[in-house]
């Protein structure tokens, strides 16, 4: 079995958590008004103070999120990969922190935790499709 959830081009790809959310939202044209009104804020004045506020994807009204602890995954499934496949089959994206030193696409040798978006799998080739700053460079997708 093979399944890939829809993912578009994010309007901004600065931080992974925002890029993942924006890539999911990119497929819906109805989301554009909200994104332009509440996410993209462009304003400049001569002596304006810019107060940085992070984008909280958990508070995005256009996406329903659930936080499932790894302990719950371990209780309910024989293996974590089965949980990921089941979630994708049911049209859920998986946002997870991973040790990217274990993933060749990242080209990192030392243990390093980074958040990736898992949105597809291919059982025949035993691989998953992720989106992230692969190799901590440009935002994109890779089969792992």
Listing of model-derived features with the role each one plays in the protein:
Residues 2-28, 33-144:
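Conserved active-site-adjacent core of cysteine acyl-enzyme catalytic domains
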């Amino acid at each position: 079995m093979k399944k890939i959830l829809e993912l578009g081009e994010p309007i901004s790809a600065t931080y992974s958590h925002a890029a993942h959310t924006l890539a999911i939202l990119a497929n819906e044209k109805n989301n554009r008004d909200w994104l332009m009104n509440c996410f993209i804020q462009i304003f400049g004045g001569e002596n304006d103070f810019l107060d940085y506020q992070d984008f909280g994807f958990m508070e995005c009204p256009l996406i329903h999120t659930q936080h499932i602890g790894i302990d719950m995954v371990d209780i309910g499934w024989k293996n974590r990969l089965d949980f990921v496949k089941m979630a994708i089959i049911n049209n859920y994206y998986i946002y997870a922190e991973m040790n990217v030193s274990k993933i060749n696409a990242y080209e990192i040798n030392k243990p390093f935790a980074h958040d990736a978006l898992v949105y597809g799998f291919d059982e025949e080739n035993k691989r998953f499709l992720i989106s992230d700053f692969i190799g901590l460079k440009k935002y994109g997708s890779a089969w792992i």
